[in-house]
Amino acid sequence: MDPKRASGGATGDNQYMTFTMGPALLFCPADRPERYQKAAERSDAVILDLEDAVAPAAKKRARGAILAQLGSGGETAELDPSRTIVRVNPVGTPDFEKDLHCLAHTPYRTVMLAKAETGEQLKALEGYHVIALCETAIGIVNAAEIAQAPNVVGLMWGAEDLIASMGGTSSRKDDGGYRAVATHSRSTVLLAAKAAGKEAIDSVYVDIPDLAGLAAESADAVASGFGAKACIHPNQVAVVREAYAPSPEAVAGARELLEAAAAAGTGVFQYKGKMVDGPILKHAESTLLRARLS
């Protein structure tokens, strides 16, 4: 199956979509097909993982599971391609080519490339909508180059793989906050994505029981400009969604501010004792956009 002609892929000069999945993306091991539908139902998009979530000896079985559910029903029914992402193994590994061969026989055209490190690597995924996962030192340093690839629709960063690639032991300090290098990498990926007009996806929160910590990190992701956040457990989805859905008070305040701006008819004006200009109005517009999407 030609990726450019398959379901979910556009054709012509502008064949690559704008990434709109989210805000809660849920990983699901590809070798657990009985979980596919549940993961899809509980999230905004499911990530079928052929990489880290699958043991080397089970990768062949995982690819077979993806193919086997096509056209089937029940708990292993075929997933909606517009809400499905497949994470493939890194370019240059034996499993990468096998993953592509599998994908060519499916309708799934949004791919997450594990350990993306250069823009050149993205040529191997021409015709696919790619989320480039920057999770090595090289990938972070080259994030801006990677984001410029035409088929890249978004960047995500991976904290634990990044630290491991540098010989470290943990991305977080004892208080739960990120170490400086992780914070720098998170910001680097966010800026690279937004500068290229692509979406940015925040890394997973690995402390599954700590929903309060996840809520705080998700709120920061929203405020910073990340368009989505990845999850590793269904219980995390509601927390991420709540963070991205503005409160009724925030929506009302944003509407009032934009109405006041329209009435003022000037570039800069005072509103409730504060000076308001273009960037502040964009914040209000972003709040209303998130309200419509939630």
Q: Where are each of the predicted segments found?
A:
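Expand to "…catalyze enediolate/carbanion chemistry for C-C bond making/breaking, isomerization
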Residues: D13-S294
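N-terminal amphipathic/basic-hydrophobic helices that include classical n-h-c signal peptides
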Residues: M1-Y16
